[in-house]
Amino acid sequence: MSQVAYLPVGKREQTKVQNRQAILDAAREVFGELGYEACTVRDIIRRTGLAAGTFYNYYRSKDEVYVALSDEGARRFTPLLKAQRAQSADWSSFVRAAIEAYFGFLADEHKSWLARRPVDEPIPHVHGETPEMTAVFNEVRQAIVDEIARGGAPGADPDYLAAACIAIAREVGEKMVARRPIDTKAAADFVVALIEGGVKGLPKSPV
């Protein structure tokens, strides 16, 4: 079961957190068993044991539930990314450590519910920016800015480079979990080589 990142005060707030977590846990199971496209909100509600009205107090659609699950994943990954940045001596070591941590995280998530789905089933993309996604982006961007400041990375545009690194890792990660067996090392080697090689050819830009 996933972890809740905060502790509420008061019985009412405790109930809200428990209901929200029950919906997310049920959705994770239903998405894994039936597939995102095939399942309905009713399938999720039945699994929670909550009333339909209670569900709609928190989410309006299965799309919103999927976004919430994505947010939860990003929230849990952000501390891992911070730890990698703190432990890395330079830009290259950070890229390697961050990509390996991300792909390991994806592989673990895959075991929880994606592994029960057909390998060729499309995974829905989350559109729009959430606070958790922004936190991941900002952590990558700050790592790039820090490395530029101490001369460990070329003076590339940090916003563009952070966005490119995240996009590459996300897209390759989707392909990685669709393969059998899942090879996190091969995927990480490919992405690191692509990022490092691409950075070398970038024009320098002041921060």
Regions found by a protein language model. Name each.
Residues 113-118, 156, 206-207:
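Short, hydrophobic secondary-structure boundary micro-motifs
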Residues 103-127, 142-145, 174-178:
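Amphipathic alpha-helical segments used for helix-helix packing
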Residues 68, 82-110, 161, 165, ...:
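Hydrophobic alpha-helical connector segments
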Residues 1, 101-105, 155-175, 186-198:
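Hydrophobic alpha-helical segments that form the core
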Residues 75-78, 124-152, 159-163, 186-189:
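Amphipathic alpha-helical packing segments from all-alpha helical-bundle domains
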Residues 22, 30-64, 68:
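Helix-turn-helix
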